[in-house]
Amino acid sequence: MAARGGAERAAGAGDGRRGQRRHLRPGRVLAALRGPAAPGAGGARAALAAALLWATWALLLAAPAAGRPATTPPAPPPEEAASPAPPASPSPPGPDGDDAASPDNSTDVRAALRLAQAAGENSRFFVCPPPSGATVVRLAPARPCPEYGLGRNYTEGIGVIYKENIAPYTFKAYIYKNVIVTTTWAGSTYAAITNQYTDRVPVGMGEITDLVDKKWRCLSKAEYLRSGRKVVAFDRDDDPWEAPLKPARLSAPGVRGWHTTDDVYTALGSAGLYRTGTSVNCIVEEVEARSVYPYDSFALSTGDIIYMSPFYGLREGAHREHTSYSPERFQQIEGYYKRDMATGRRLKEPVSRNFLRTQHVTVAWDWVPKRKNVCSLAKWREADEMLRDESRGNFRFTARSLSATFVSDSHTFALQNVPLSDCVIEEAEAAVERVYRERYNGTHVLSGSLETYLARGGFVVAFRPMLSNELAKLYLQELARSNGTLEGLFAAAAPKPGPRRARRAAPSAPGGPGAANGPAGDGDAGGRVTTVSSAEFAALQFTYDHIQDHVNTMFSRLATSWCLLQNKERALWAEAAKLNPSAAASAALDRRAAARMLGDAMAVTYCHELGEGRVFIENSMRAPGGVCYSRPPVSFAFGNESEPVEGQLGEDNELLPGRELVEPCTANHKRYFRFGADYVYYENYAYVRRVPLAELEVISTFVDLNLTVLEDREFLPLEVYTRAELADTGLLDYSEIQRRNQLHELRFYDIDRVVKTDGNMAIMRGLANFFQGLGAVGQAVGTVVLGAAGAALSTVSGIASFIANPFGALATGLLVLAGLVAAFLAYRYISRLRSNPMKALYPITTRALKDDARGATAPGEEEEEFDAAKLEQAREMIKYMSLVSAVERQEHKAKKSNKGGPLLATRLTQLALRRRAPPEYQQLPMADVGGA
């Protein structure tokens, strides 16, 4: 029976160990494993040193044995061979040089040697029965190596990438005029400005169309409304006239303006009086206007915000655009010829001109259609070489010129759902045609129509596929054979549109770009595409796809090369099986087996692990007959009760049942054999010691290969800060401040209401116009009449104003009360005067006369008789005295006023004489005269 490993029963002198042939050189194998320092791999110097070393050891070992005859070691007795214990080893010489030793020492040495030569508890040994041919195997033939593909359908084409258009719509607008009112106070030797304010007022639309754009002139008068009343201002407080417009002193790029005057009029009055002067400067300024989506208002570069869409008009459905003003404030003129502001000449091309008059400014701009001038998407990049491939149900558009990859769904995107997106198809088709003419006109043909896809991050990819001329010829040949059409071929390969809806914009802050929607006629009811502010994720996606493609291609090539290498190694395995079939079978089957070749097939038997058997290694490798064992002899048993079996230690702890592996004995014999978990060392075919694994250096033939295929990863856009957060980082929001300030009057006041004046002013204005039409004389007469009427109106207005004042009303009430009291007192006085004039006129005199009369009459005397004549005379005297008093008062008043005095006295005298009865004179007695 052939032993495992290929060792023969009787080897020749030149044979080596088991499994070794003349053409196998261990030095070269070790040199390949360990490098130049391995044994057998050195040069001539290393070989000479090794030869000298072996010669020295041979002389040292041959010297003691030179005096002894060469004897053959006796064969072991049969009874010892049956014992499971190893044969006795020669005892070491005693101290006196004899070979004998004491019985106790011999017993201890034998016990120690027996323990050292026994296998450990964790040792594993295998017993392999000889292959009988019951199981026959063969090597598998070479395999065909597959060519790995990435599994993607690439389509070459031209792409145009669009993003969200966040740029505002800009256009030119024109605004008008300034009014400056200055109040001064004049002193004796100086003048001071006590107040000055500037007000911006609008210009009438008729003045703009008839004067500014026709004659390049402007009136020096301004009419406007303030606090519900109409105000008229004149430049330099003079009559209005048509002033020419002249360029402004300071001009800058994009900022142009024209005006009528440079002076600010300041009026100076008399000393100690205030005087107000007015300046009207007609300013025509060209400004830049900006409007953002949804275009419901626009802002001027002056800070004014107009709450009307710049596309508001009266035709083509533009009246549905947003406006916050009454229709009377807006006017649109078709076929309007405007004037060039730089040269002052009238332009030849007519335009549609919009005019809007607000409270402080008149704005004019050219009306244009909305859909043709604004677009919610803007062209970002053109990719003249774009590849579209399908991966995991998605499309990937790779633009190497941009180093970016965009991922989208496999369905096309309907741009009809995006408001104001008509520009995308037109611009993209024009860009694709231009790129094709410049680069691919002679090498490729366009296939199919323009397709649009919504990529992640809010990018719209317009892709036009194309084919190379060679591939197009193949398609045409295929169509000729199948009688098909080119449209049908491309339609079968093109992606089918699906129910794709536009991605709606993220909720924004109130008043933000996405807070309002425009009219339904422009498609604003659909969703607007919102693009992220950074495209780094597309660059990362391109980088990852590039690395993934490169690594997967490398792995596929490595797998193919591995397959080819396995096919080539199959031939080596076939040859190795002929040299050592058991080792080849064990390596191929991945378990311990014994095998032998049966021609081109192999007989295999599986080895069995020795359970709890005991294995002992013997201390000598010398065999009877002058030969030596090539493998150490062992004895093993299955369990405690089984008979021991003599055998040899095979390779890798294999137990061979017989002892048939022998070789000629050689000098300087040194061998290491694997025994259980350790190694045993033999020198000159005698057991020396057990060698742990740590004392032997390990050389490995394994090459580690740890490969992991990269998984598919898609980078998603991540916004760290939203637009609302970025806009809210500043301390103040200037646009919001302006919006709130200018919305104040619109929110809380009615700027369109006009307070009507009274009829007196209308009458005065009519009289003034009447007298002005009569010439110079009429104007002079009108001035006098209007002055008098104005004085009367002023007096009445002053009285009304005084009464309207709370203090004036109180004073008026007190005056009325005082008048009533005075009237009551006057009424009492008149009543007393009528009843007793003498007492009323001369109360003191009458009282004194009465007292004298009472005192003159003595008590007890009789009163004299009453004289009726005297009483009548007294009455006449009192009457004339009152008349004289009245005449004197009238004359005094007449003298004081220097008119009407004598006339009034004469009339009173005549009146008194007319009513006087003819006098009856009686001559008085002389006694009375003398007594007087």
Curated annotation (Swiss-Prot):
All ranges on the Virion surface side of the membrane: 63-806
Glycosylation sites: 105, 153, 441, 483, 640, 706
Feature: compositional bias, Low complexity: 1-12
Biased composition (Gly residues): 511-526
Gene3D superfamilies in the record: 1.20.5.1890, 2.30.29.100, 2.30.30.1230, 6.10.250.3280
SS bonds (residue pairs): 128-607, 145-563, 218-282, 375-423, 628-665
Changes after translation: A proteolytic cleavage by host furin generates two subunits that remain linked by disulfide bonds.
Keywords assigned by UniProt, alphabetized: Disulfide bond, Glycoprotein, Host cell membrane, Host endosome, Host Golgi apparatus, Host membrane, Host-virus interaction, Membrane, Signal, Transmembrane, Transmembrane helix, Viral attachment to host cell, Viral envelope protein, Virion, Virus entry into host cell
UniProt keyword Nucleus present: no
Residue ranges of the region described as Hydrophobic membrane proximal region: 751-804, 784-804
Pfam family, one: Glycoprot_B_PH1
Intravirion side: 828-932
Positions in coiled-coil regions: none
Record note on quaternary structure: Homotrimer; disulfide-linked. Binds to heparan sulfate proteoglycans. Interacts with gH/gL heterodimer.
Protein name in the entry: Envelope glycoprotein B
Organism: Bovine herpesvirus 1.1 (strain Cooper)
